[in-house]
């Protein structure tokens, strides 16, 4: 699991990081001390669990928690604070737990186990749904070039772009160019992984390497092969939802 600790007190963050490492089972544990750092962390990582303090230097933790819950796939939120008067509000946000400082390892472990149990159940359900969806879509994409039909495995397709009537399909080991329109391929791609980010671009979200802020409040997506594709303004909402961004 991946965890994010949001607290403006360095000692509290350090203590919680230490306890989580003692409990074990975490692939990654990151920290944020304010809203800006939180948003940056959520942009580049999909977390399973967030430990959130109520009193932050630039925003109330309850308000931040409400924003996080609006994500397409929000992480489990555990409020970790010295203030007990916000517990009702926290659970109204469907918080997984509410832990009071000073932290104890046993209490933290109880909260983590709640998240793990819920995640295991959700993963099983998601796997079943994904298998059903995959069954309804071809696993290979037929691409006709020079009287030959190439069968491209969808998991190897990194992104597809079109310019001046030429559609370029980027894969993990080759680049294919065709005059077929982008819309033709969009209908055949598995929507579990592929998303249109621009009228000229479709990407495989499994091949996103990095997302950079760009002009006019948009993003530039850098794919695993180094190709850059800009997110169109009208596609921003769907793109942010697809990568779990606020």
UniProtKB/Swiss-Prot annotation:
Source organism superkingdom: Bacteria
Phenotype reported upon loss of the gene: Deletion significantly reduces target tissue survival during calcium-daptomycin treatment and increases susceptibility to host defense cationic antimicrobial peptides.
Positions where 4-aspartylphosphate occurs in the chain: 53
Alphabetical keyword list: Cytoplasm, DNA-binding, Phosphoprotein, Transcription, Transcription regulation, Two-component regulatory system
InterPro entries: CheY-like_superfamily (IPR011006), LytR-like (IPR046947), LytTR_DNA-bd_dom (IPR007492), Sig_transdc_resp-reg_receiver (IPR001789)
Gene Ontology molecular functions: phosphorelay response regulator activity; transcription cis-regulatory region binding
Segments forming domain Response regulatory: 2-116
Modifications made to the protein after synthesis: Phosphorylated and dephosphorylated by LytS.
Pfam families on file: LytTR, Response_reg
SMART domains (UniProt xref): LytTR (SM00850), REC (SM00448)
Gene3D superfamilies assigned: 3.40.50.2300, LytTr DNA-binding domain
GO BP term (any one): regulation of DNA-templated transcription
Cystine pairings recorded for this chain: none
Gene Ontology annotations for the cellular component aspect, listed alphabetically: cytosol; protein-DNA complex
Record localization: Cytoplasm
Domain HTH LytTR-type, chain residue ranges per copy: 141-245
Subunit architecture: Homodimer; when phosphorylated.
Protein function: Member of the two-component regulatory system LytR/LytS that regulates genes involved in autolysis, programmed cell death, biofilm formation and cell wall metabolism. Also participates in sensing and responding to host defense cationic antimicrobial peptides (HDPs). Upon phosphorylation by LytS, functions as a transcription regulator by direct binding to promoter regions of target genes including lrgA and lrgB, to positively regulate their expression.
Name of the protein described by the UniProt record: Transcriptional regulatory protein LytR
Lineage of source species: Bacteria, Bacillati, Bacillota, Bacilli, Bacillales
């Amino acid at each position: 699991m991946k965890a994010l600790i949001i607290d403006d007190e360095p000692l509290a963050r350090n203590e919680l990081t230490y306890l989580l490492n003692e409990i074990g089972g975490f692939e990654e544990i990151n920290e944020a001390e304010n809203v800006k750092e939180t948003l940056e962390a959520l942009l580049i990582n999909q977390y399973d669990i967030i430990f959130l303090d109520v009193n932050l230097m630039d925003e109330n933790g309850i308000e931040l928690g409400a924003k996080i819950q609006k994500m397409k796939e929000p992480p489990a939120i555990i409020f970790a604070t010295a203030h007990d008067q916000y517990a009702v509000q926290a659970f109204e946000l469907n918080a997984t737990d509410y832990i009071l400082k000073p932290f104890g390892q046993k209490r933290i472990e109880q909260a983590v186990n709640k998240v793990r149990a819920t995640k295991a159940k959700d993963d099983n359900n998601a796997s079943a749904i994904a298998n059903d969806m995959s069954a309804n879509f071809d696993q290979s994409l037929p691409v006709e070039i020079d009287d030959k039909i190439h069968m491209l495995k969808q998991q190897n397709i990194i992104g597809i772009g079109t310019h001046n009537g030429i559609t370029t399909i980027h894969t993990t080991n080759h680049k294919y160019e065709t005059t077929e329109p982008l819309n033709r391929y969009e209908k055949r791609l598995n929507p579990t992984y592929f998303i249109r980010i621009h009228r000229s671009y479709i990407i495989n979200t499994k091949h996103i390497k990095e997302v950079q802020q760009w002009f006019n409040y948009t993003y530039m997506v850098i794919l695993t092969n180094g190709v850059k594709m800009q997110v169109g303004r009208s596609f921003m909402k769907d793109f942010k939802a697809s990568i779990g961004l606020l």
